Every structure is written in structure tokens, then in C-alpha cells.
Amino acid sequence: MRDYKLVVLGAGGVGKSCLTVQFVQGVYLDTYDPTIEDSYRKTIEIDNKVFDLEILDTAGIAQFTAMRELYIKSGMGFLLVYSVTDRQSLEELMELREQVLRIKDSDRVPMVLIGNKADLINERVISVEEGIEVSSKWGRVPFYETSALLRSNVDEVFVDLVRQIIRNEMESVAVKDARNQSQQFSKIESPSTRLPSSAKQDTKQSNNKQSSKGLYNKSSQGQAKVKQSTPVNEKHKPSHAVPKSGSSNRTGISATSQQKKKKKNASTCTIL
């Protein structure tokens, strides 16, 4: 079972205590008693999961402002309440929200905007459209109009806030897991191994030996190829190669002259 700490914030007299007591105890408070700080606990089941809620009902903005920062630091989700019969209470929420974001140092703080006392139709000075407009300016923060007297949307605002907290936790866990996986993958792809100085010198010497050995092998292979190529060219020397100038030309001329002399001798013999 998870424990969530919720904080109810707003100006004095907007009905924060009535809203909280109606949710926790199912009772409507018909008398106004300025709250210094009240803490309530309630166990609730949401989406088949059980949660233990600690709800802190705080004083109005004008009272005990020094304690408000402690409330905000410890809170996990915030219900910002104004009264539809009091315009100033909505204006004070603007500053209060900025304070929450500054202390939490985040723009993604679980939060619900609540216009309470919606049952006082004749005393209303803030329309539903104005509440929706403020919600849009705040980044579409969930907006509800409630009535503690009629128990209208009372459970819904607390359930919505708890679901926001759950969603934020799941997203933060997913981001953390993705970051860890990327770090592990980078370690596998590019392992960083540092060698001592002596090992580095040994590796350099072995690399130099291998490189010189490779050059020697290449040169010896080249010489072997040259030695083999010489007899092959002589063996397969073409028959119609042009002879060199010199003695070979002379031998060719003497052979033809001897053939002519033989023919003359043969002819003279037949005449006799």
C-alpha cells in the first residue's frame, strides 16, 4: 500500500476544510473555524490498488505563511481551491501556484484547480468559463467546480490528483530505466580499458615487430615472383619475335647465296 501526501491550498474562507472533511468523513461543516493546520488520513482504492492518503488542510494564504513552504516541500500533490463567490481568492491562487512550482523546481507538479461553493448560484461572481481559461493558462491543469454541501465532485478531485501522482511516478521510472539501458549499451559498444605504461610499451614493440615482419614478407614475396617470371617468359617466347641486328642477318644472306650456287652447278651438270 502506497502512502501519498496531499496538500490543500487556498485563501481563507474558500471551504478547504469543508471539502476535506466531506471527503474523509462524509460530513459537512456548517460553521467556519479558521484552520491553522489539520491532518487527515483516508484509505482509498483506485484502479484496483489501495492507497493511504495523508491530507494536509492548511491555513489561508494570509495566515502562517512561514509554514507554507514546509507544506509544499513535503507534498506530493496539491489541490488549489478558490471560491466562485470571491474573485480575489482566484487571483491569490496565481501567486500560490508560482510558489509551488518554484519550491518543487518543476513544471510537472500534480495539481488540481477547484472552484468551490458552486451551490451558491446567486452569489457567484466567477463563471465556469473563467475557471476553464485559468486551467488552460496553467497547461490544462484539471479543473473542477465542487460543492462540499452537496458533495458534488468531492471524491473526483482527490481521485484525479492521486492518478496524476501515479502517472508521474511511472513516467519518472520509465525515464530512469531508459537512461540506465542507454548507459549499459554504450559501455558494451565502447568498453574503456586502460593499460599500464609497461603494457603499452609492450604493445607498441609488438606492433613494430609485426609491421617490420609484414614488410619483409612482402619484399620476399616480390622477389620470388620476379625469379619465377624469368624462365616463364623465355620458355614461351613467341616464334615471330624480331631478331636482333648483327650476326643473325649475316647468316641469313650466306644461306641464300649457297642455294644459288648449288642450282648453277646442277644446271651445268645436265648440259655436259
Swiss-Prot record:
The keyword Lyase does not apply. A lipid is attached at residue 269 (S-geranylgeranyl cysteine). Residues 177-272 are annotated as: Disordered. GO terms for biological process: axial cellular bud site selection; bipolar cellular bud site selection; cytogamy; establishment of protein localization; maintenance of protein location in cell; positive regulation of Rho protein signal transduction; regulation of establishment of cell polarity; small GTPase-mediated signal transduction. SMART domains: RAB (SM00175), RAS (SM00173), RHO (SM00174). The modification Cysteine methyl ester is found at residue 269. A motif (Effector region) lies at residues 32-40. It is found in: Cell membrane. It is an enzyme of class 3 (hydrolase). SUPFAM superfamilies: P-loop containing nucleoside triphosphate hydrolases. GO terms for molecular function: G protein activity; GDP binding; GTP binding; GTPase activity. It catalyses: GTP + H2O = GDP + phosphate + H(+). Residues 270-272 form a propeptide. Keywords: Cell cycle, Cell division, Cell membrane, GTP-binding, Hydrolase, Lipoprotein, Membrane, Methylation, Nucleotide-binding, Prenylation. CDD domains: RSR1. GO terms for cellular component: cell division site; cell periphery; cellular bud neck; endoplasmic reticulum; incipient cellular bud site; plasma membrane; site of polarized growth; vacuolar membrane. Pfam families: Ras. It is a lipid-anchor. Its EC number is 3.6.5.2. GTP binds at residues 10-17, 57-61, 116-119. Belongs to the small GTPase superfamily. Ras family. Ras-related protein which binds GDP/GTP and possesses intrinsic GTPase activity. Involved in development of cell polarity during the cell division cycle, and essential for bud emergence. NCBIfam families: small_GTP. This is Ras-related protein RSR1. The gene is RSR1.
